[in-house]
Amino acid sequence: MTSQQTAFPCAIVPSSPAECRLLGLYQQRQEGLWMQRVKIIGGILTHHQWAALADMFRRFTPSTPLLLTTRQDIEFHNLTTETIPLLQAELAHAGLTSVGACGDTLRNITVCPGNGLCHDTPDLTAIVLALRGYLESYVGIYSLPRKFKISFSACTKACAQPWINDLGFVVQRENSAVTVTAIGAGSLGPRPATGILIEENLTPEDIPALAQAAIRVFDKYGDRQHRAKARLRHVRERCGDERFLELLHEEQLEVKREAPPQMPPISVPDLHYNHVADLNIIYGGLTPDQAEAIAALIHNHAVKARPQTHHRISLFARNAAAARNAVQTNPLLKQLADGPDVVSCPGTTYCAHALVNTHAVEKALRLQVPDTKNRAVRISGCPNMCAQSGVADLGLIGRIRKDEAGNRVEGFMVVTGGGMGTTAAMAEKSHDFVSSEKIPELVKNILHETF
């Protein structure tokens, strides 16, 4: 939970683009309209917050849905400079913040939705909140060379995708002990690469020093002149893996000499929660009515509703049968309870960087390919790969070509075989360019022939 004193709502929209981004603001492709990103701290929203978000969407952006992102954030679209300060004040009142949701800083720390709920998994909420507070106290945290992303997974399934984060912690219970594996220096973008194993058999007490060391190495050696080569991964590539790990270890020793704060203990609760369902959010967009239905489900049936990083919301409950019945008997939720594993970025609907209409392709796939055989199909509107296409089972990356008459044709590079960031596997190119209207048939064929 974020207090009103630490949410920092703005009184006016800053004139500096960098300051806007630090407040989670981006200008849309539509002139005069803005996107506001909001962090879901610890991957958790209370029923009060779901209800408050529904109310805010009705009042501030009634014509657009509440958009989930692939990093446990929420986005408002079609805001104006007049409505942004009002919205940020409402967010702060609800215990939500947009500070650090965008920009060259520590982004939202993502957490696998099943932590502390799936059988025999540690509860990571307390350590994630404490680590966030510790790292945000670093003097250079809001002026890093580029964004810095951290994730936490609660078992070896690595649902929080450590291999595509700047730093990913995989926390697991082994007998009576909790051990940690650290993976780092991976990222997507136009030239994506997964990370490397940093260290195994760490203790939870090692986490703050390693995380602080990684940020300091990034701050010292990150390329501030070339944004396309400014992630921690590029530091590793310039130095080589061996020297990069040496720099990290040296900085880690220095941080330990400063005696970083002790983190809360990681416990493995015996809560007996069961997985109820995954709500499959088309385009990542929820209506206010659906958000209110989720709030009621949490409040009335003691359900834990945890956003994933794949436009889905995982539902857990002690009384799974009653919760499942509540989902199936509510038309607003039942329509979200199944569907193919297809995720698209906002594309040309909102994003100024997008090349193609991703939502149209997602809609076509959901209609024409209703069964993706449990394979992840990811649709990105440009080479930045915000939909994580570069590590998908089947990824589409937006491109533009011209036909013989010189007309612009929207289409995609097609890649296959990725590990979705849960492993080091990158997707590999299978088709250089396929026009948008031919994508559904191609996806059908690839799913039939490959998986």
Segments predicted by a language model, with ranges:
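Small-residue-enriched alpha-helical segments and adjacent helix-cap loops
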Residues: 2-13, 33-179, 209, 279-406
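Intrinsic, low-complexity N-terminal interaction/targeting segments
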Residues: 12-30, 96-103, 266-267
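Active-site cores of enzymes that catalyze phosphoryl transfer or operate on phosphate-rich substrates
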Residues: 17-19, 258-285
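Short, flexible, solvent-exposed loop/turn segments with mixed acidic/basic and small polar residues
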Residues: 25-30, 62-68, 221-224, 268-274, ...
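Gly-rich Lys/Arg/Thr-decorated short loops/hinges at beta-loop-alpha junctions or inter-strand turns
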Residues: 29-37, 190-195, 273-278
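Terminal amphipathic helices with adjacent charged low-complexity linkers/tails
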Residues: 78, 82-83, 91-94, 219-270, ...
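Mobile "lid/hinge" segments at catalytic clefts and subdomain interfaces of large enzymes
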Residues: 144-241, 390-451
